[in-house]
Amino acid sequence: MTDRYVYDLSEGSAEMKPLLGGKGAGVAEMKRLGVPVPDGFTVTTEACVDTMTRKGEWPEDLESEVWDGLKRLEERTGRVLGDDKKPLLVSVRSGAVISMPGMMDTILNLGISDDTVEAIAKEAGNERFAWDCYRRFIQMYGEVVEGIDAHIYEDALTALKEKKGVESDTDLSADDLKGLVDTFKKLSNEQLGGNWTTDPREQLMRAVDAVFRSWLNPRAFVYRKANKIPDDLGTAVNVMQMVFGNRGDTSATGVCFTRNPATGEKELYGEFLVNAQGEDVVAGIRTPRSLAEMEEVLPEAYHDLIDTMKKMESHYRDMQDMEFTVENGKLYLLQTRNGKRTAAAALKVARDLVDEGVITKEEALMRIEPAQLDQLLHEAIDPDHSEQPVAEGLPASPGAAVGEAVFDADVAAERGAKGEKVVLIRFETTPDDIHGVIVSQGVLTAHGGMTSHAAVVARGMGKPCVAGARGIKIDAKAATLTIGDTVIHEGDMITLDGSTGEVFASGLKLIPPQINADFQEVLSWACLLYTSPSPRDQRGSRMPSSA
């Protein structure tokens, strides 16, 4: 136990991960290394655990410590939460000790209100940006903190875009967004009986509490059970000054990996969106652009990012998964963590890091979980088939998936639990679909990219995934997938090739797996390192049981 619950960013380090969570410790370590990160503070995992122990009641000193942390942040930034001249806006994000991508909650743009929106617009010289932040905040806060159904906001947004004749949120004007904010406020008050709070300090307290509660939500339980993560670790809460990827054409947000998490190759891998905020990428709301294109759009930030990727992989001696924002051309890092990867990628990365002299063979073996190796023993599509793909998307997670099409995560979970082979098809997956993803043979989405939550979770579980498939139309109510003249109904057979991104409207034949050179090489290390000629050594010789 520590004697306090709140730590400023400058007080943390990578070694404090059990206390500050992965995100808080990772950002603190980046700051220590001179990487540009937003300022902030972290509420510890112990605060969450103590709150759960007290059945949701905060420990006695926690609220005052949060206020003290906020005051110090305000002094460092020269901004004040709720101020109508120089307002402070913050993000409130979860941060588990063991990475759980997308399973817990985030609130962005907290601090924006009727009292501050004009000051934000004036300072930025961009009225549209300010009202975009405001509508995003109301929706995110309403869903996460107040429990308002997401479709209430989404339906209003969709109706506005249809009325204006536009397809993308970015096509809406400042006046359009101002009207949307009024609509969102009205809808929120209707749902809450007029009890929507506008006090940013109260909103901050409730947001921190909502992140604590998200540790206990059903999808988090399902993910922890599937990945054998203890339920008593709790989550930290990171309160950080907002940096904005939605300030215009010189701003962006994205996710990158220092190596390919699907194959393990040492190559550029990532995605970004111009004029967007982070949740747009990881939630799969918009299909992002390849990171390689960023060099043309934001060259200075791109080269800074490449340098930072190299620096962080060298520091952690492992493949990193990083989130970043570019605000008016300046790069900020929001997160770094050891990246989720497929079994094939785990072997490739481990072997290459040994060859590069970064880690030893013993370290490499300890990083490969025995359960992962089972993924390499799955069947593959017979290359001699004559079928033509009906659609192609992004090869988000490799492998072959053959099963009956289903369009609802609950249906997938029910049928999968009976041992039936199903492929989950969604417009975009959300973290709430995790129970359906776990039992499916594979996942197909119409939207989202290779760094969306769907892709990251699928790779970590060894599930084939094709994301952002072009030209497909999904009708969830009718349970149909339409691609040109081809219509796939629920129960029809479908095949996904997560290695190529191809989709086939039939069940293709599968063949036994082929053991690759990386697998053979790593097994040879195990034989050499864990088989000793000494009788005494032989008695204790064994492969490591876990990473």
Protein language model annotation of sequence segments:
Residues 542-546:
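Hydrophobic alpha-helical segments, chiefly the membrane-spanning helices
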Residues 1-385, 420-423, 430-435, 441, ...:
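Nucleotide/phosphate-binding sheet-loop regions of phosphoryl- and nucleotidyl-transfer enzymes
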Residues 336, 351, 355-356, 463, ...:
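Phosphate/diphosphate-binding loops
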Residues 37-39, 443-445, 464-468:
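Short hydrophobic alpha-helical runs that function as membrane-insertion/retention elements
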Residues 258, 413-415, 434, 484-487:
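Short, surface-exposed secondary-structure edge patches
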Residues 530-537:
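Conserved small/polar residues in nucleotide/adenosyl-binding loops
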Residues 358-440, 502-510, 516-529:
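Protease-associated
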